[in-house]
């Protein structure tokens, strides 16, 4: 689990996301509270439940990006789902419990990676010995049995040195390696994914592990053998227990587009993909036990972060019980022209930086001037104001249109330099931005 302070978390998010300080503070506090809870005594820890968050803001202002970056920072089981993908239990479509099953799969994978990392050094030693055995097979006795090998013979040490220095990387050897089982793919009817997962696991277990002699280069053999030896050193049952503990105490679920499951007006008949989904989400958020292929998972201490644009619906259109389960409300502001300018230059791997790097691969030098960047930001903001406001995503459209000519002709213009200044931007985008009908279809 990440031990970063709220200030450090916000600072890290600032490297990728412009503005939205309230939302950053809220998720930073929530993430730190996960760590604080784990420092408490067991009797008190059980009583401390997470304060779930509802992020409200127009499209393209950074809600999903905050979740994406948070997942990388947290180093805990994290899953992002779209609320619109689910339907009420009993109807065709995904059930909300599959969120916890998927989160548990993520946790098992994460725990497995961490466990493999811990035993990597020992696995590398064992893999090295197996490669040396293949290079220097031990002599056999009269009965055809391999004699005890000399671990520290001078020849073996010479080969070990060469192996570690990479001098033998391209030499081919024949080794016994575990053969990956043929995957049994079963098409799942909607709502029956769990049953098909169990069937697939059953078929794979029936097949068992088989080994096969293969000829491969030493560098590839080492990689395969390290994985094989590491897998032997790891206790799979312990891994599952750790993963379930990790999900129950550190898991985070990000539910996007929650506004799309609000009830709109008076609807007669069952509203299976809206209010029904909200009612199914309630027990998950409040705390229930979900059956997964790895074991039973309690959701009492999983943190839920929901987000939505709420352009048509309002947060008050959510059913009251669900509103009560999302006590922390954070509003994200719409982006201004100045925000667009900062988005183009300040974040790590900004859009302008990406285009410059892409063109460099063709030996074309592209430079964005300050007035050119301001003109691009103004153009994107103006189109958002006059047509549909899609936030920072508009910058992708505008930049792609602006760079169209350079990108297409780059192969013939190797060695040339292009300066994207205000005049260049006006010449390419001026007419489109001013003509509302054109910008609706092209930008």
Curated annotation (Swiss-Prot):
It comes from the Bacteria. One of its GO terms (cellular component) is HslUV protease complex. Pfam families: AAA (PF00004), AAA_2 (PF07724). It is found in: Cytoplasm. ATP binds at residues 18, 60-65, 256, 321, 393. GO terms for biological process: protein unfolding; proteolysis involved in protein catabolic process. Transmembrane segments: none annotated. GO terms for molecular function: ATP binding; ATP hydrolysis activity; peptidase activity; proteasome-activating activity. Keywords: ATP-binding, Chaperone, Cytoplasm, Nucleotide-binding. ATPase subunit of a proteasome-like degradation complex; this subunit has chaperone activity. The binding of ATP and its subsequent hydrolysis by HslU are essential for unfolding of protein substrates subsequently hydrolyzed by HslV. HslU recognizes the N-terminal part of its protein substrates and unfolds these before they are guided to HslV for hydrolysis. A double ring-shaped homohexamer of HslV is capped on each side by a ring-shaped HslU homohexamer. The assembly of the HslU/HslV complex is dependent on binding of ATP. This is ATP-dependent protease ATPase subunit HslU.
